[in-house]
Amino acid sequence: MAPEPAKPATNSEVGFSYELGVDIEITEGNWQSVRFAKAIAPNAEAKTQDGQTYDDIGADHPIKVGESWTLTLEIQHQRLTDGKYLPEVEAFKAATEPDALGNKATVHVRWYDKPATGKANPDDAYEGFGTVSITRSQTGTNDIGGWNITVTGQGPRKKIKNPLNAAG
């Protein structure tokens, strides 16, 4: 007799790719949600040093000494009646202008669990400062345009309280 299929965990629900929120700090303390976003992909990669000793009997022994992080996303092209883009896109773009050097080329972002229904995970939220690169996406002859944005971390990301839980 074949074994019974595994039953889903009780009181749990499947998570979806769209259940992640991103904000950019437009001015100090003024966070703007990034709207019309997709393909949001935060990444943190350990920076290691070799800690191998004879006790490891030839095996690797990487020791985490820090991390590098990036946040990539795509924002659908939206234009306001005055011709400008959404405020969050304007903030990302401003950090990539030719005269944006040093702190002018730095943005403050946060990303966090944002479920479609139910409570947000209070422990799945981060923020950091980073340098921005931006390119156009969806550039076909009849595509809905967009922006591919990559924020490359300057220093470590910081664990924060999920802003959705703080608000509610």
List the predicted regions and their residue ranges.
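Solvent-exposed edge beta-strands and adjacent loop segments
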Residues: 2-80, 129-144
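Short, surface-exposed, polar/charged, turn-prone segments marking secondary-structure boundaries
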Residues: 49, 71, 100-103, 158-162
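Short beta-strand and beta-hairpin "edge-sheet" elements
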Residues: 40-42, 110-159
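Short, cysteine-centered beta-strand-loop-beta hairpins and adjacent loop/turn segments enriched
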Residues: 78-84, 157-161
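Short, surface-exposed linear patches
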Residues: 64, 93-101, 152-156
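Short, acidic/charged, Gly/Pro-enriched secondary-structure junctions
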Residues: 85-125
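Protruding loop/beta-arch "assembly-hinge" segments enriched in small, turn-prone residues
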Residues: 1-11, 144-168
